[in-house]
């Protein structure tokens, strides 16, 4: 199963009591704030969940797998996510419980 933004909005509707429009707007605003922070070059730290950070990747040589031709992969910034230890532990516990 995949958790979507629509699922998150439904959960806010059911568990918090927001109307569907408010719930959808809140989810959209949350992700928009994360996107804007990353675009501005800021890290995003969500306590107990994890960190979104920007990382600079240097130019490096690459290879076309079909032709074997060497092509440069340009330098770029990428978004990385590092799960918090708390999140990792919870997922590990849930996975360990499911396999027994």
Swiss-Prot record:
Entry keywords, A to Z: DNA recombination, DNA-binding, Transcription, Transcription regulation, Translation regulation
GO cellular component: cytosol
Keyword Aminoacyl-tRNA synthetase applies: no
One annotated GO biological process: regulation of translation
Membrane-spanning ranges: none
Family from the record: Belongs to the bacterial histone-like protein family.
The protein's name: Integration host factor subunit alpha
Protein source organism: Methylobacillus flagellatus (strain ATCC 51484 / DSM 6875 / VKM B-1610 / KT)
């Amino acid at each position: 199963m995949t958790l979507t933004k629509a699922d998150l909005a439904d959960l806010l509707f059911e568990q918090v009591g927001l109307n569907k429009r408010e719930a959808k707007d809140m989810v959209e605003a949350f992700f928009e704030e994360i996107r804007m922070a990353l675009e501005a070059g800021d890290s995003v730290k969500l306590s107990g969940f994890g960190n979104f950070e920007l990382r600079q990747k240097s130019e490096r040589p690459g290879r076309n797998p079909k032709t074997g031709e060497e092509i440069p992969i340009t330098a770029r910034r990428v978004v990385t996510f590092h799960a918090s230890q708390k999140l990792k532990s919870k997922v590990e516990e849930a996975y360990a419980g499911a396999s027994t």
